[in-house]
């Protein structure tokens, strides 16, 4: 069983008891069996479990818990970054919490993710005219501007050579289908807490913590997926 297949168990629209089939066992699993399996998964892989369901907007509590657990992971790894060890304990925790929050947002990002348009401050109008960046919507999608969220683009040279459309991973988004949160945005948020982290220090050192935490979320989700699969085998 995969994590995606159990999202429906958290939907309030589902009032009928759901029965699913385990991949190997001929015995059907009832809704209570699945919830018990989820409880065990949450205990064994707390970060991955909370991160996934927070990403799927199933629970705001899971989202907050994932960021809190991720911040603790960041705190344990902060000794690798001299710029962070020089901060006071309060400042260090505040900075790491900010980085963890943005790491989660980056992890949960998809082509359909919407955010307020910075050009018009979410108003849809610039100087009384329709904002050209968001077309007056006040929000912009994270979908890659080159591949439009598909993750692949036409290789024009090979297409002309072969006479049929030839696709390749989009170079702009590396095949993700969406644009990641710029690290400069995270740096500006960190500067609201402390001025001790300079742009040079951020680019050379502290920014790596952001990348580490994003990768950690993906690793932990994979571990939660594997754990659930073993439990429901």
Model-derived features: where do they sit?
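Alpha-helical oligomerization segments
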Residues: 170, 181-233
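N-terminal alpha-helical interaction blocks
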Residues: 1-115
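Generic secondary-structure boundary signal with a strong preference for alpha-helix termini
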Residues: 51, 60, 161, 187-189
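Charged/polar, solvent-exposed surface patches and flexible loops
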Residues: 8-9, 51-54, 97, 102, ...
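Short glycine-rich, low-complexity/disordered patches
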Residues: 84-86, 109-120, 219-232
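Cys/His-rich short segments
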Residues: 111-180
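Short, surface-exposed, charged/polar-biased interaction segments
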Residues: 73, 152-155, 165-168, 191-194, ...
């Amino acid at each position: 069983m995969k994590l995606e297949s159990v999202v429906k168990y958290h939907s309030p629209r589902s009032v009928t008891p759901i029965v699913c089939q385990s991949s190997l066992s001929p015995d059907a699993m009832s809704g209570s069996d699945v919830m018990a399996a989820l409880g065990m998964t949450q205990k064994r892989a707390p970060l991955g479990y909370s991160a996934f369901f927070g990403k799927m907007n199933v629970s705001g509590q899971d989202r907050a818990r994932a960021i809190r657990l991720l911040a603790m992971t960041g705190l344990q790894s902060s000794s690798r970054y001299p710029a962070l060890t020089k901060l006071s304990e309060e400042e260090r925790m505040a900075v790491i919490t900010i980085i963890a929050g943005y790491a989660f947002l980056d992890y949960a990002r998809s082509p359909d993710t919407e955010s307020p348009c910075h050009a018009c401050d979410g108003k849809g109008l610039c100087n009384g005219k329709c904002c050209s960046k968001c077309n007056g919507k006040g929000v912009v999608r994270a979908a890659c501007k080159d591949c439009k969220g598909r993750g692949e683009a036409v290789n024009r040279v090979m297409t002309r050579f072969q006479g049929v459309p030839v696709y390749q991973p989009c170079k702009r988004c590396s095949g993700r289908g969406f644009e990641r949160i710029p690290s400069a945005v995270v740096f500006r948020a960190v500067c609201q807490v402390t001025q001790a982290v300079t742009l040079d220090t951020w680019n050379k050192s502290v920014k790596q913590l952001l990348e580490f935490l994003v990768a950690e979320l993906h690793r932990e989700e994979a571990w939660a997926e594997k754990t659930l699969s073993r439990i429901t085998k």
